[in-house]
């Protein structure tokens, strides 16, 4: 076990998260069709600033992420600063840790506050699966470079004449791991088979996610943390997530065919998170700065941890590796948690991680620990639903989970919450948040 690692400044200040906000999340090619991630980021940060009452010139830094990169805006963070009326002197840089990107943004801001180089900052992420960087073939790309260096028209025409018709076809972004060629769904299928996770259990978790998310919206629990987003030319607005199935049944889920292993698989579109557009952000500062500004923090960041594992087998087990570290650094156990929010990339991945949390053999063989961190009390788990229901704009999910968990802890009178996620490349993230 690791020793506790308090997240405090030299003056003993804790890291306060004073506010959090997100856009409604929308399925690919629906409400945000044609709206790039950078615009979604501007929308949410502008509204976060307006609601916070914090003067824009007080923001020292903005750390933001985007997984599906757009060549025309490689530093999304700086574009958001320049497009939201913030001071041009506000520092800004972008990060990417796949599905854990906004976890990384929050961690970076926390470390800067601890170091004393930043007092007030914004962290978050945005992604669009509707506005994609459609590329060209390698042959055409190479030819275009050569054409740019050619001196005469005849040289240019000769270069183009070597191309074949297929070289002119557009190339969609890759959906597989660069290093292995495996899709996320392939790994989810492998984990379902390895750990004996049935199709019925996957469908049941997906149904639970949608039911709880629908209930959260019906009870008005999300209204304060989800803004109304107006879509250019601003005649239309989206007020709620549009992926949530409010009246689905197990019978409907059972009718769907497997999406990856067509013959023997159990992972379907219904028990997986969909491609999604959206943005989310949190405002962070030192505890003393929050007091100085008269702000009541949503809560505090108690600890965080990241992990990296093999990409060929069990690539989505990141939460099972990162969570024990985050618990140790916070000086607590799984039983001390009031809430647990785990990113549901796939129902199979989620259920596999829950099994590993409770597995003594996994703890001994993979983590070098004497025993498992424990079995998860499902009454604490994803109590407002998860990513299968809300959707998953890759870089925004972490900020959504943190904000959602803090608000729910406040409704329950305080406590400790775990937010954790798997990520492409065998990465994992876990954060412990606290509300008094």
Curated annotation (Swiss-Prot):
Which residues does the Swiss-Prot or TrEMBL record annotate as the active site? 99 (acyl-thioester intermediate), 392 (proton acceptor), 422 (proton acceptor)
| UniProt pathway | Lipid metabolism; fatty acid beta-oxidation
Q: Where in the cell is it found?
A: Cytoplasm
Keywords of the record: Acyltransferase, Cytoplasm, Fatty acid metabolism, Lipid degradation, Lipid metabolism, Transferase
Record's NCBIfam families? Answer: AcCoA-C-Actrans (TIGR01930), FadI (TIGR02446), PRK08963.1 (NF006516)
EC number(s) stated in the UniProt entry for this protein: 2.3.1.16
In terms of one coarse class, where is the protein primarily found? cytoplasm
Question: Which protein are we looking at?
Answer: 3-ketoacyl-CoA thiolase
**Species whose genome carries this gene:** Yersinia enterocolitica serotype O:8 / biotype 1B (strain NCTC 13174 / 8081)
The cross-references to InterPro entries, in alphabetical order and at most eight, read:
Ac-CoA_C-AcTrfase_FadI, Thiolase, Thiolase-like, Thiolase_acyl_enz_int_AS, Thiolase_AS, Thiolase_C, Thiolase_CS, Thiolase_N
Any one biological process term the GO annotation gives: fatty acid beta-oxidation
Q: Which GO terms describe its molecular function?
A: acetyl-CoA C-acyltransferase activity
Regarding protein family, the annotation reads: Belongs to the thiolase-like superfamily. Thiolase family.
Q: What does this protein do?
A: Catalyzes the final step of fatty acid oxidation in which acetyl-CoA is released and the CoA ester of a fatty acid two carbons shorter is formed.
Q: Is Lyase among the key words of this record?
A: no
- Which reaction is catalysed here? an acyl-CoA + acetyl-CoA = a 3-oxoacyl-CoA + CoA
Identify the Pfam families for this entry: Thiolase_C, Thiolase_N
Gene Ontology annotations for the cellular component aspect, listed alphabetically: cytosol
SUBUNIT field:
Heterotetramer of two alpha chains (FadJ) and two beta chains (FadI).
């Amino acid at each position: 076990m690791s020793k506790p690692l308090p997240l405090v400044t030299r003056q003993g200040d804790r890291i306060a998260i004073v506010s959090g906000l997100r856009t409604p999340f929308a399925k690919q090619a629906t409400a945000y069709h044609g709206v790039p991630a950078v615009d979604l980021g501007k929308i949410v940060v502008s509204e976060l600033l307006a609601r916070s009452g914090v003067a824009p010139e007080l923001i020292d830094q903005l750390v933001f992420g985007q997984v599906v990169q757009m060549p025309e805006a490689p530093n999304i963070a700086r574009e958001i600063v320049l497009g939201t009326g913030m001071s041009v002197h506000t520092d800004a840089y972008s990060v990417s840790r796949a599905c854990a990107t906004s976890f990384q943004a929050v961690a970076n801001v926390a470390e800067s506050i601890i170091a004393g180089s930043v007092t007030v900052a914004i962290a978050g992420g945005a992604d669009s699966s509707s506005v994609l960087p459609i590329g060209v073939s390698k042959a055409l790309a190479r030819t275009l470079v050569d054409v740019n260096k050619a001196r005469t028209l005849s040289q240019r025409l000769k270069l183009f004449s070597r191309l074949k018709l297929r070289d002119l076809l557009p190339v969609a972004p890759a959906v597989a791991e660069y290093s292995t060629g495996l899709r996320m769904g392939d790994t989810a299928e492998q984990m379902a088979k390895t750990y004996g996770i049935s199709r019925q259990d996957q469908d049941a978790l997906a149904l639970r996610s949608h039911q709880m998310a629908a209930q959260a919206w019906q009870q008005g629990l999300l209204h304060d943390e989800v803004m109304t987003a107006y879509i250019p030319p601003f005649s239309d607005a989206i007020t709620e997530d549009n992926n949530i199935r409010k009246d689905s049944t197990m019978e409907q889920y059972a009718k769907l065919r497997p999406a990856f292993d067509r013959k023997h698989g159990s992972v379907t579109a219904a028990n997986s998170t969909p491609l999604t557009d959206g943005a989310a952000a949190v405002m962070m500062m030192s505890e003393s700065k929050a007091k100085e500004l008269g702000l009541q923090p949503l809560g505090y960041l108690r600890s965080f941890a990241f992990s990296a594992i093999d990409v060929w087998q069990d690539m989505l087990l990141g939460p099972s590796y990162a969570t024990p570290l985050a618990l140790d650094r916070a000086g607590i156990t799984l039983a001390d948690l009031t809430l647990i929010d785990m990113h549901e990339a796939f129902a199979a991945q989620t259920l596999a991680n829950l099994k590993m949390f409770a597995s003594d053999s996994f703890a001994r063989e993979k983590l070098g620990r004497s025993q498992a961190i424990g079995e998860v009390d499902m009454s604490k788990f994803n109590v407002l639903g998860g990513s299968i229901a809300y959707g998953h704009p890759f870089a925004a999910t972490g900020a959504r989970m943190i904000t959602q968990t803090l608000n729910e802890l406040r409704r329950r009178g305080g406590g400790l919450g775990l937010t954790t996620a798997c990520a492409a490349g065998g990465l994992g993230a876990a954060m412990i948040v606290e509300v008094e």
